[in-house]
């Protein structure tokens, strides 16, 4: 299978940005970070996006996702966690090579923090709401992914596991 668009999917705080940058360096492909691209597309600062109502932010995230997908390959992109919620977006994800960066719920809560783009939800949600979101989205991420990586404590090791999967023929990453 040949792919030239790698989509990193998973919850907020999974490490899409960190792992995406490492993969970009390893593969010599551009990396499109959701937060950076969202800020550029909207013309809003990260701080302004971080204060935006969640529903409005999700609309912008969907527009950003579609805009990134329209770009020429090859590239790696970190996809906003909310994009998985709509079937039309899941269909687009399934059309590319998606890598699910999976981690346990406790790690999601710990990593997500309470500030930054998309973190509005964590400021107002209790653990049961975060658990509900995880329970709802986890199978959706898994169903859309062609490769799932159970994350370790090292982003470098996780990126190397992805590169190894690319190199052993699970997918072709030659651009």
Feature map (PLM): residue ranges:
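ATP-dependent small-molecule kinase phosphotransfer cores
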Residues: 33-92, 118
């Amino acid at each position: 299978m040949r792919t030239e668009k790698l989509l990193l999917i998973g919850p907020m705080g999974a490490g899409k940005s960190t792992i995406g940058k490492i993969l970009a360096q390893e593969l010599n492909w551009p990396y499109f970070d959701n937060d950076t691209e969202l800020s550029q597309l909207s013309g809003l600062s990260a701080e302004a996006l971080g204060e935006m109502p969640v529903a409005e932010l999700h609309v912008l995230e969907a527009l950003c996702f579609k805009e990134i997908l329209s770009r020429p390959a090859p590239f790696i992109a970190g996809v906003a966690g909310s994009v998985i919620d709509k079937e039309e977006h899941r269909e687009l994800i399934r059309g590319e090579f998606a890598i699910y960066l999976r981690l346990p719920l406790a790690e999601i809560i710990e990593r997500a923090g309470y500030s930054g783009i998309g973190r509005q939800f964590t400021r107002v949600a209790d653990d049961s709401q975060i658990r509900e979101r995880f329970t709802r989205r986890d199978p959706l991420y898994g169903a859309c992914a062609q490769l799932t990586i159970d994350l370790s404590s090292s982003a470098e090791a996780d990126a190397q596991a992805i590169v190894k999967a690319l190199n052993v023929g699970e997918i072709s990453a030659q651009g």
